[in-house]
From Swiss-Prot:
Family per similarity comment: Belongs to the SurE nucleotidase family.
Residue numbers binding a divalent metal cation: D11, D12, S43, N101
Provenance organism: Prochlorococcus marinus subsp. pastoris (strain CCMP1986 / NIES-2087 / MED4)
Protein name per its UniProtKB record: 5'-nucleotidase SurE
Reaction(s) this enzyme catalyzes, per UniProt: a ribonucleoside 5'-phosphate + H2O = a ribonucleoside + phosphate
Compartments (UniProt record): Cytoplasm
A Pfam family: SurE
Cofactor(s) in the UniProt record: a divalent metal cation
GO CC entries: cytoplasm
Keywords assigned: Cytoplasm, Hydrolase, Metal-binding, Nucleotide-binding
């Protein structure tokens, strides 16, 4: 296919293995690659933006393969893509990729994900965008994951990729010969136990670490076409999960089941 202008970001920061592997995979495919990502770890920042302090950027080409332009940014993942699209790039990219994340981004966890937020910024600007994650914090075969991501992205670009859809890709932590297939999936609804670990400091004051463990992955009510399986279930079966996500969070159920609101209080004296 023709060479694409690709913007790559992440939430693990400019020194992370995953983003370097993804940028290298895109470059090997003959694409023009620009990286704009946080200058430090920014995981679980969601779609936060920096409003109370200036954003600073510094060139980081030396961290990537020759031919890749790179910046480290002091802001969040969403800041990085927003700044790149508005100020740092000469022209609008053909594709935005975010990742490869060091760990899964599954189900309703995506609302906390800086990886997904970076890709969502591209979607909001009508640029085809994909978030990419390896579903393990320990598995390090990012080269293979980058190859998978680029093959999927190129096929999606050549076919019909609605600009209003973000694609959320999760890759199981196993070798090539153990992966069974790719499945279109829906988001599961994740529930956690022991979300906070309470501790006491030397002065006797309590403090907390967020440290929940996922115990339930509930089936969402909107199953999607043909009763799609959940992203979590497919990863558990060593299948690649690809979930289309819309930025439009509007509820599409019946108005009849919504609460009845009496508005007489508006004009009450």
């Amino acid at each position: 296919m023709e060479s694409l202008n690709i913007l790559i970001s992440n939430d693990d920061g400019v020194f992370a293995e995953g983003i370097r592997a993804l940028a290298k995979s895109a470059l090997k495919k003959g694409h023009k690659v620009t990286v704009v990502c946080p200058d430090q770890e920014r995981s679980a920042t969601g779609h936060g933006l920096t409003l109370q302090s200036p954003l600073r950027v510094e060139r980081a080409d030396e961290l990537f393969d020759k031919g890749i332009k790179a910046w480290g940014c002091s802001g969040t993942p969403a800041d990085c893509v927003k700044l790149a699209l508005s100020e740092l790039l000469d022209k609008k990219p053909d594709l935005v990729l975010s990742g490869i994340n060091h760990g899964p981004n599954l189900g309703t966890d995506i609302f906390c994900s800086g990886t997904v937020a970076a890709a969502m910024e591209g979607t909001l600007e009508n640029v085809p965008s994909m978030a990419i994650s390896v579903a393990s914090f320990k598995w390090k075969n990012f080269e293979f994951a980058g190859e998978i991501a680029m093959n999927i992205a190129e096929q999606a670009i050549k076919d019909s990729w609605p600009k209003s859809l973000l694609l959320n890709l999760n890759i199981p932590p196993c070798e090539r010969n153990k992966i069974k297939e790719l499945s279109w999936t829906r988001l599961s609804i994740r529930k956690y136990k022991n979300q906070f670990s309470k501790r006491e400091d030397p002065r006797g004051d309590d403090y907390y670490w967020l440290a929940g463990e996922a115990v339930l992955d509930l089936k969402s009510k909107g199953d999607g076409p043909k009763n799609w399986p959940s992203d979590v279930s497919q990863i558990q079966e060593n299948k690649i999960s690809l979930t289309p996500v819309e930025p439009d969070l509007f509820w599409r159920g019946s108005i009849d089941v919504l609460p009845k609101i009496n508005t007489s209080f508006i004009n009450a004296s």
